[in-house]
Amino acid sequence: MTVQTFYLIGEKERSTRELDVGDPKTVNALRQGLAEVFNILSAEGIDFHDCHGPISTIESILRSESVGITVNGHPVRYPQQPQGIPIFGNHFEIYPDHLGNHERLFNKYGSVIRTNNMGRVTYLTNDPDIAALAFRDNDYFTKAPSSASHPLYGIRDQTALFLCDTESPAWKEAHKFIPPSMTPRAVRHYTPLLQQSVDTVFNVLDKFDNNGQAFNVYHLTAKLASQVICQLVLGVDLHHFDAVDSPVHPIIVLLQRYLTLNRRVQTKGAWYSYLPFGDPVALKNTRRELYGLIEEAVITCQKKNGGTTGDLPIQTAALHATCLVDYLARATDEHGNKLRHEYILSNTLALVGAGFVTSSAFLSWLIYSLVEYPGQQDRLLQELVDHGAVSDKRWTYDEIQALPFLDAFVKEAQRMHSPSFQPARNVKKDIILPGGWALPQGSILIPSIPHLHHHTAYWENPDRFDPDRWRTEKVKNRHRSVYVPFAAGPRSCIGFNVALQEVKISLAELVYRYEFVNATNEGIEYDPDFIVIRPVNFYVRAIRRTEWPARSP
């Protein structure tokens, strides 16, 4: 038996332990064992010290009186936060510009920061090594919106794939049925439906052009994204573009209100959510009303398709379904089981909600990138012409995937202007992260997507819009977690194939038909009270094209 005393430098009194280390053959084997004992998530970062300084051999470690441990050259340390004020904590240090202020705090305090927002404590990181660990669902991290500090707590639903805890019984069942509806094969089947939905916007854009009228881009893309997603999920035409002033469908009105109210409640202390008036009550009432409308839509869709369709194997059902609700009603696993009705209802809402909010904001930023960065719109138009675009072109999935500049443009826009920013994960144990950062059990860690995407250590000139960077070996061989627009791991976005095909078809159709011109007379602002980053005051004109470039030689 070989016993040695180990402790974490920076926390010697609390962490000192006498451990039987057996007969370790290598320093790396000892590191692995100690990482498990102390919940250090980067065993390779462990270094050893005695009273004289660093030690690096098994012999020196075992003969020392006691051995201190550092992680990646750092003692154990706790993330810092700005000095708060009573009741409000750091609220006014962060909002309204939470993107800019979190960047400032990363620069000041390091790669993991702590914020106290009216009593609600959250940790954020811009370190891709830490993000990669957080996105794993294992003994140390999970996704649990049922935790009161989680950003999705106000809209949690233990029967919905996106909104339930990983440990919820529904997650395993829903995860079995829903992802097959979003595979590349399935998206290939849905591509004509996506294009048909996108093309409905032409009626309104032509009228804007005839009147010489600029428009608020997010107002338009919110209508467009919801038109597309409701056609895809529910098989219903929202008639958003029958006329310039066509009203937004009640489902979408309620959905936007629901998500805004949740953000308002979750960016304040837990106490705020218990108030018997104001936003917390409105959130509950909106939830009830929204679920009612979704249930009506699901039942209507099932009745419409129920008389002429039959059950299909789960792996091929999406290739024959008219929409995702039709798929969920028909998909059958190897045991003849189907997704239960209550799961269909909640996951339909989750699919509509997640698909709408992300795509609507991202489409806005894509149009922003067309008009803000010189030459990009012309390059994209040229590529479309070179690949056979015409006014009545019916794009296939493979044709859209074969447009390299379109792909690079979308990637770069998503890097520069990611609408998603808070893929929160729950810490299951007291842990020590790379860099020696200690987080307590029960805390919330958010890998901050915008700050990962702009990290100067991993991106050359990160504030420069450069689609060509995606052709370089440096970017092709980048750290896997420095670009995570759809998060990563088992709880990543399952709809990314659909989302990317939707925005690519939208760009192909819109850029071929219209030239977009910036009509904004002030700096672009984003909405701090929404669940994604969306521009609120961005205006453009869409001018109908009358001529196109010749094909490249």
Curated annotation (Swiss-Prot):
Subcellular location: Membrane
Known EC number: 1.-.-.-
Record flagged with keyword Transmembrane helix: yes
Effect of a null allele: Fully eliminates the production of asperlin.
GO cellular component terms, semicolon-separated: membrane
SUPFAM superfamilies in UniProt: Cytochrome P450 (SSF48264)
Pathway annotation: Polyketide biosynthesis
GO MF entry, a single one: iron ion binding
Superkingdom of the organism of origin: Eukaryota
Regions that span the bilayer: 351-371
Signal peptide (from-to): none
Cited InterPro entries: Cyt_P450, Cyt_P450_E_grp-I, Cyt_P450_sf, Cytochrome_P450_monoxygenase
Cofactor: heme
Keyword Glycoprotein appears in the UniProt entry: yes
Induction / repression: Expression is controlled by the asperlin biosynthesis cluster-specific transcription factor alnR.
Membrane topology (UniProt): Single-pass membrane protein
Keywords attached to this entry: Glycoprotein, Heme, Iron, Membrane, Metal-binding, Monooxygenase, Oxidoreductase, Transmembrane, Transmembrane helix
Pfam family of the protein (one): p450
Gene3D superfamilies, sorted: Cytochrome P450
EC top class, as a word: oxidoreductase
Glycosylation sites: N518
Function summary: Cytochrome P450 monooxygenase; part of the gene cluster that mediates the biosynthesis of asperlin, a polyketide showing anti-inflammatory, antitumor and antibiotic activities. The first step of the asperlin biosynthesis is the production of the intermediate 2,4,6-octatrienoic acid by the highly redusing polyketide synthase alnA with cleavage of the PKS product by the esterase alnB. 2,4,6-octatrienoic acid is further converted to asperlin via several steps involving the remaining enzymes from the cluster.
Family membership noted in the UniProt record: Belongs to the cytochrome P450 family.
Name under which the protein is recorded: Cytochrome P450 monooxygenase alnD
Classification lineage: Eukaryota, Fungi, Dikarya, Ascomycota, Pezizomycotina
